[in-house]
């Protein structure tokens, strides 16, 4: 982009009544301490004047030595590319009619991962955060596995197939780090648009969930995205308790699970269907 080695570029959505939602650039030459807005902002506008056009995610596409940007555009994702990080060209779109519908697409991300740990067999996972109307209420994170050829994303599944990254109520705005070596590590926002505006707050709303390492695996001739807490979270463990095997009929109570713990618990369960 011409700002020198070690510079940091930040892409963000600027929103106003006059200009709508547009994508802008800011750069830092002091290791992120301060940022300067690019004098020729915006770097990207919706060609059709779309109102909901936000959440840019930029990644390096090595096979063509170029940068790719994904932007959420109402009920689809739009792909753009650039060789100088300033001038962006439209490539394609994906998502209309796919997955849970009709939902607002937001906060995209896309990563390439080995399937079942095989580095010679890789697939792309397109992460799409959607709101509202999800299966368990409000907002959630779905994903699509498939192929990306540098121009368009081709989904493995039929449009009516929906895959959820997490089945909890508080999992949204999932984004991946780009400096975690061989691992792909993601962090979601631990909240839901059903009630996030009434959560007590000062400088922020809710919190982030635990970081998790992503992976692709096969099951029943299909490909799914796994999300396991990163290994570093084991350092948070303190007191532990083993519970012997038991059969669950209706209710089963375990008294005083951890005597010195008044906060969160981690449960590791092996469940066998009766």
Identify the role of each PLM range:
Residues 113-117, 124-125, 131-132, 136-152:
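Acidic, glycine-rich loop-and-beta core segments that form the ion-binding/anion-interacting portion
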Residues 16, 27-35, 77, 86, ...:
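A generic secondary-structure signal for well-formed alpha-helical elements
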Residues 1-3, 32-60, 71, 89-112, ...:
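Surface loop/turn signatures of beta-propeller and other carbohydrate-active proteins
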């Amino acid at each position: 982009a011409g700002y020198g080695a070690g510079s940091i570029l930040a892409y963000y959505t600027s929103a106003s009544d006059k200009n709508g939602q547009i994508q802008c650039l800011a750069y830092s030459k002091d290791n992120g301490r301060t940022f300067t807005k690019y004098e020729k902002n915006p770097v990207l506008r919706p060609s059709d004047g779309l109102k909901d056009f936000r959440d840019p995610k930029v990644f390096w596409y090595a096979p063509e030595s170029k940068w790719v940007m994904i932007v959420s555009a109402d009920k689809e994702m739009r792909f753009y590319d650039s060789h100088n990080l300033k001038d962006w060209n439209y490539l394609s779109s994906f998502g209309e009619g796919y997955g849970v519908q009709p939902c607002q697409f937001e906060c995209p991300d896309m990563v390439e991962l080995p399937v079942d740990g095989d580095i010679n067999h890789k697939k792309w996972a397109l992460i799409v955060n959607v709101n509202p109307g999800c299966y368990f209420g409000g907002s959630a994170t779905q994903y699509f596995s498939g192929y990306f050829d540098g121009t368009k994303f081709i989904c493995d599944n039929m449009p009516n197939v929906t895959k959820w990254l997490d089945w909890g109520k508080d999992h949204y705005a999932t984004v991946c780090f780009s400096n975690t070596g061989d691992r792909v590590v993601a962090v979601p926002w631990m909240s839901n648009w059903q009630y996030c505006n009434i959560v007590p707050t000062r400088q922020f709303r809710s919190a982030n969930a635990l970081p998790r390492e992503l992976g692709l695996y096969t099951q029943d001739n299909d490909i799914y995205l796994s999300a396991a807490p990163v290994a570093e979270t084991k350092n948070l463990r303190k007191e532990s308790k083993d519970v012997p095997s038991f059969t669950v009929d209706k209710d089963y109570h375990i008294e005083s699970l951890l005597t010195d713990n008044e906060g969160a618990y981690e449960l590791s369960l092996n469940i066998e269907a009766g």
